[in-house]
Amino acid sequence: MTSKESQSAKFIDLHGHHSSSKSEDRDFLYIYSYSPKINDLPEEGQFFSAGVHPWEIEDARISFEGVKRLCGESNCLMVGEAGLDRSIVDDSDLEQQEEVFKWHIQLANELKKPLIIHNVKCLSEIFRLHKQYPNHSNWVLHDFNGSLSDIQECQKRSIAMSLGPRFYESQTARIAHTISDHKIDLNLIFFETDERGDINIQTIYEKFAQKQEIEIDDLKDRIWQNLKALLGTNLTS
């Protein structure tokens, strides 16, 4: 990486549902995640993603056309969050979630934008759908909570993973043990604050760098390059 590229790298908060005091800071790039019944519309000029969260798919008031229109805006960098959540339904009710998820997959493909994915205990289903749509846009699993083998399988399939604060806050989360016990290939790795507006994304970078024994500037540069690859564009500072 050239010195110019290094100087332009930012701390990336790939996914958050809160307003961010750092969103105007030249050293930070925050992507606000909009879901119709969870939070407010993005502010003018703000980078964002838009989608129908699995928790809200039964709400008849949701306008899928409105979400589609938002996703077509230039400041919308990703489609979603959308996905599958086994914790709120039994297996027989996953079908409705899957149909809505497929709608998002097709929309992301149509717009040629990455898809950010909500996954709770449905990784095998995510992999199946990933294989079912071979010519899809880039995918990201948000708040990833998996083992080393899960990370390696995602990297093999070119599915990106975004890590939230649970890898250093939780004593029981799988990702906490994975990060503590193994050296992680930074290919396709990102970080996020999710619902935690009380946490600075830089803190998450620093915690990961400390646990993985790498320089924070090297980590920052690598995640920036990951974002450029994810979006298929050259980002400017």
Predicted feature locations:
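Mid-domain alpha/beta scaffold segments of enzyme catalytic cores
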Residues: 1-237
